[in-house]
Regions:
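N-terminal strand-loop element at the rim of the active site
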Residues: 12-18, 35-97, 189-192
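Membrane-proximal helix-turn-helix segments that form the acceptor-binding/catalytic region
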Residues: 109-117, 163-182
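A short beta-strand/loop micro-motif in the catalytic core of glycosyltransferases
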Residues: 123-124, 177-187
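A short, histidine- and acid-enriched strand-loop-helix "catalytic/donor-clamping" loop
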Residues: 129-132, 145-164, 181
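An aromatic- and histidine-rich active-site surface loop
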Residues: 99-109, 122-143
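Carbohydrate-associated surface elements
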Residues: 188, 207
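A short helix/loop element that forms part of the nucleotide-sugar donor recognition site in Leloir-type
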Residues: 213-220
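Histidine-centered beta-alpha loop that forms part of the nucleotide-sugar donor binding/catalytic region
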Residues: 13, 66, 127-128, 150-154, ...
Length: 220
């Protein structure tokens, strides 16, 4: 067995849709699978392995579904979420409390079982939300390296109108420090995450996923 071979897991949501993130994930996962054991753990149940040439690749797939039952856990998490967002100060202690409700305990158990069952060397969270899932269970994962791969800009997450993570800067900062690494797509974003949230990030630019053909019209 090749001693340099690694078992790598990408934890992602929509894998088989039409989008930039899906395309980039496919390019990188397929390239890595030439020399490593690569699996994508997806919440996407609309499986279509013909997308992006997955069916002809060595990339493996696992799936996970979170059942959102309106049980006692659901309402307890709702209460904690309300308190954190509307009443409590935002600090390290309250961020830890909010982590309980952001990703429900029953969901955490599911994800821990999936990840630890695969005996992976590295796990990569695709997108901020799924990276936060991994951060909340980092101490319980038997994995050497857990990394966040953030595809949204700092402004899109926190500053623009209708940001993806409104009012969650403190929570994001505290949770992400649990991870072994954070990857962003630009040096400017790396600076913003460092200066505003105290998070050290590495910059890895997305690969070219479309091959340009011909010359662009001067009209554009």
């Amino acid at each position: 067995m090749n001693s340099s071979l690694m078992k790598i897991l990408f934890y992602a949501d929509t894998v088989f849709g039409f989008g930039g993130v899906q395309r980039v994930l496919a390019v990188i996962a397929k390239a890595l699978s030439d020399e490593h054991d690569v699996t994508i753990l997806s919440t996407d149940t609309d499986v279509n392995l013909s997308m992006y040439g997955y069916g002809q690749s060595k990339v493996k797939f696992e799936y996970i579904t979170y059942q959102g039952n309106r049980d006692l856990e659901f309402y307890f998490c709702k209460c904690i979420s309300f308190l954190y967002k509307m009443v409590l100060p935002h600090n390290r202690a309250t961020s830890k409390l909010y982590s309980y409700s952001f990703f429900r305990p029953s969901y955490k158990k599911q994800l821990i079982a999936k990840v630890n069952g695969g005996e992976y060397d590295a796990v990569i969270g695709v997108h901020a939300f799924l990276s936060l899932h991994l951060a909340s269970i980092r101490k319980r994962l038997n994995v050497k390296n857990v990394t966040a791969w953030i595809h949204n800009s700092y402004d899109a997450l926190f500053e623009k109108n209708n940001p993806y993570l409104p009012g969650l800067k403190s929570f994001f900062s505290n949770e992400m420090k649990r991870l072994d690494g954070i990857v962003v797509l630009s040096k400017s974003d790396a600076s913003l995450f460092r200066d505003n949230l105290g998070l050290e990030c590495m910059t890895i630019y997305n690969p070219l996923t479309l091959e340009p053909r011909g010359k662009a019209s001067s009209e554009y």
